[in-house]
């Protein structure tokens, strides 16, 4: 019956520019999947991550591929079931690619029920139609053997349906198909394909059901096998314009294979991506990115979207987190809101009634002022204390308004006052008699002050009538210049907000002769001084004469901005405002040149953000440091200009201001690192011409540092701890770039410069020192026609995948790779392990000699396949006996470096 079954190559019909021969693939039509007909379903999916694919030299797998819901103490395995059918049946499973349509994979399944073709089969029925596969392992095929393995699989599948053999033409077709499959196949991801066959009338299992495909299974040793996870963000909301800087902590990611995706889960399907470069990914565990703008600039209320991490190549995503876009704040400083307030009419300040008097009171005599209800509102700063409530005090106590009662033109004498007040004496006696002499004395003093104030106001009004100069009125009312409205704005604030230049000049003149009042530096409820508002509203002339009368430019608003910071954010008017500040001669101006805002940006950085070479010149000519570093990441003005791709600013900084092209950030990145990482050929060329160091290394090791020893011995406590960071080479601009044009520029520049001194080998393991003969032999092995790109797989295993595209077009990719590994401080054991895992035992024999065999580190521990813990090779050997030792030595000897 076995010979009656033909698994075929389901799904391997076409891929891009190649097609399989339909005469080779002849699958039978599956039974229709209907509500009444039989069909196959997956009951338990396989676990996607944490399972390691095994090479042949490693021996059989242990534990088996677990199920998706498997836990400690309750293990599950991939399970399928035939529904709507009872009777004998056969269920088989093989490996297919992770891309659609599924195609046969070069890897094979191994286990008790698996054949040489990598197909595992079990029988089910007639009652229980469920099949559980509890002993599946994945045999990893190396790239070197991949071509031969694929040809063998295709040949055997073809011969099962036609035993007479293949012609030469068919053999060539199979080889071409295998070659094309190799180009598109990912060796780190597989899927299980379950196929069910029912018994036919002749007794053979030849009636196929529709196959079902499992979810992808990732090799735990592959760089992209770890789950993506967002651990923390410092911001969950930002402006609809985008550009907000967010710090995101995450599980391990690869800087060249990660992006931050913003999206909406609705019918519109909007998505955008965070803006960051490879240098913004810190140690693979943190990303600093800038939010993208929302697709609608005008929103009335906050909008919540989602963000997630996404791998560029595999398409894997993390769990989504929420992010809120809030509406655009056009009037952050509230200037427009205050301008929209209704202007007062002439009669409003007088409390109603006739504009010559308030309330029901008549005209006051002498200098007593207006009577009636709200007349006291004219003197809020002078009436700090009064022993009487408004309108309740004795009318004869002081000359002035109150209560709406009409008053005499002169202060009455005591006798006439007593005689006149006699008819109403009973009603006033209870109020006056309890007053102590001290209170009466204070009331008299208060009345005297009011009388003097009225006299001064009257004199000012008379002077105004003669001169028509409003300053005469303001001088008499100068004590009222400190009055504030509900927003904390003084008359000077309001005059600046409304652009009343003549009023501002008049108030400033009075302020100049009344410095003791401190009006010029009073702040409103937003911590804005008049100078802040003059800068915000772009009134350069007002800025100048405010500074002349003592305005302090060093005072900060609620955002931590001084007048200079605000001037540099003023857009087109920034140069004139900045010039007015710098030429004022204020003592605080030199201090402002070296004062950061609350975001850690100095004026030179804000000038770059403003894209203004003129402002940069003004600042540097006044004493600002062009090499000043902002406090968040240590970037200079040249770093910021490079990030913004501002060719004009970069040219200006380098040629005129002589900015240091090799200045480093806190992470050791130069402007050339940023230009290369962002893929800017023009800026890269400019920086190289200006003398940028092509060999400059940042602080992130190209190869990861080895794990500290976990031994309990006392050896690791002897002597001082060594700093291994200096023993490893960091990333150069060439390591960071993904742009072909930038790579060409950097490679050409590297050929014209001297190589940097070799980095000493790491003290953590035997250093790699390749002789010319060994290097040539390895180049022949890895670059030969039979190698089929083995050097690229070696780069990935050595943690140097970022160099694959860089060295692909060189005459000897493997030679360049090995020299980089040697310069990076790579050790011999790591290279031996990588070659052994790839099945390149000849390379192992080339490197291993009598002098190096004894220097290899002791056998390391390897992870258990099912990801429930780990057991050492020695423990596995006790259970299974000694595994077959491959020629050339151990398959495991050193922890595999992780890929950046």
Curated annotation (Swiss-Prot):
<dbReference type="GO" id="GO:0005829">
    <property type="term" value="C:cytosol"/>
</dbReference>
<dbReference type="GO" id="GO:0048511">
    <property type="term" value="P:rhythmic process"/>
</dbReference>
<feature type="repeat" description="ANK 3">
    <location>
        <begin position="559"/>
        <end position="591"/>
    </location>
</feature>
<feature type="modified residue" description="Phosphothreonine">
    <location>
        <position position="429"/>
    </location>
</feature>
<dbReference type="GO" id="GO:0038061">
    <property type="term" value="P:non-canonical NF-kappaB signal transduction"/>
</dbReference>
<comment type="subunit">
    <text>Component of the NF-kappa-B RelB-p52 complex. Homodimer; component of the NF-kappa-B p52-p52 complex. Component of the NF-kappa-B p65-p52 complex. Component of the NF-kappa-B p52-c-Rel complex. NFKB2/p52 interacts with NFKBIE. Component of a complex consisting of the NF-kappa-B p50-p50 homodimer and BCL3. Directly interacts with MEN1.</text>
</comment>
<dbReference type="GO" id="GO:0002467">
    <property type="term" value="P:germinal center formation"/>
</dbReference>
<keyword id="KW-0963">Cytoplasm</keyword>
<feature type="repeat" description="ANK 1">
    <location>
        <begin position="487"/>
        <end position="519"/>
    </location>
</feature>
<keyword id="KW-0010">Activator</keyword>
<dbReference type="InterPro" id="IPR000451">
    <property type="entry name" value="NFkB/Dor"/>
</dbReference>
<keyword id="KW-0160">Chromosomal rearrangement</keyword>
<protein>
    <recommendedName>
        <fullName>Nuclear factor NF-kappa-B p100 subunit</fullName>
    </recommendedName>
</protein>
<dbReference type="InterPro" id="IPR032397">
    <property type="entry name" value="RHD_dimer"/>
</dbReference>
<keyword id="KW-0597">Phosphoprotein</keyword>
<keyword id="KW-0677">Repeat</keyword>
<feature type="repeat" description="ANK 7">
    <location>
        <begin position="729"/>
        <end position="758"/>
    </location>
</feature>
<dbReference type="Pfam" id="PF00554">
    <property type="entry name" value="RHD_DNA_bind"/>
</dbReference>
<dbReference type="InterPro" id="IPR033926">
    <property type="entry name" value="IPT_NFkappaB"/>
</dbReference>
<keyword id="KW-0225">Disease variant</keyword>
<feature type="compositionally biased region" description="Low complexity">
    <location>
        <begin position="888"/>
        <end position="900"/>
    </location>
</feature>
<dbReference type="InterPro" id="IPR011029">
    <property type="entry name" value="DEATH-like_dom_sf"/>
</dbReference>
<dbReference type="InterPro" id="IPR011539">
    <property type="entry name" value="RHD_DNA_bind_dom"/>
</dbReference>
<dbReference type="InterPro" id="IPR030492">
    <property type="entry name" value="RHD_CS"/>
</dbReference>
<feature type="repeat" description="ANK 4">
    <location>
        <begin position="599"/>
        <end position="628"/>
    </location>
</feature>
<feature type="modified residue" description="Phosphoserine">
    <location>
        <position position="713"/>
    </location>
</feature>
<keyword id="KW-0832">Ubl conjugation</keyword>
<feature type="domain" description="RHD">
    <location>
        <begin position="38"/>
        <end position="343"/>
    </location>
</feature>
<dbReference type="GO" id="GO:0001228">
    <property type="term" value="F:DNA-binding transcription activator activity, RNA polymerase II-specific"/>
</dbReference>
<dbReference type="InterPro" id="IPR036770">
    <property type="entry name" value="Ankyrin_rpt-contain_sf"/>
</dbReference>
<dbReference type="InterPro" id="IPR000488">
    <property type="entry name" value="Death_dom"/>
</dbReference>
<feature type="region of interest" description="Disordered">
    <location>
        <begin position="404"/>
        <end position="435"/>
    </location>
</feature>
<feature type="modified residue" description="Phosphoserine">
    <location>
        <position position="23"/>
    </location>
</feature>
<dbReference type="InterPro" id="IPR002110">
    <property type="entry name" value="Ankyrin_rpt"/>
</dbReference>
<feature type="site" description="Cleavage (when cotranslationally processed)">
    <location>
        <begin position="454"/>
        <end position="455"/>
    </location>
</feature>
<dbReference type="GO" id="GO:0002268">
    <property type="term" value="P:follicular dendritic cell differentiation"/>
</dbReference>
<dbReference type="GO" id="GO:0005737">
    <property type="term" value="C:cytoplasm"/>
</dbReference>
<dbReference type="GO" id="GO:0033257">
    <property type="term" value="C:Bcl3/NF-kappaB2 complex"/>
</dbReference>
<keyword id="KW-1017">Isopeptide bond</keyword>
<keyword id="KW-0090">Biological rhythms</keyword>
<feature type="repeat" description="ANK 5">
    <location>
        <begin position="633"/>
        <end position="663"/>
    </location>
</feature>
<keyword id="KW-0040">ANK repeat</keyword>
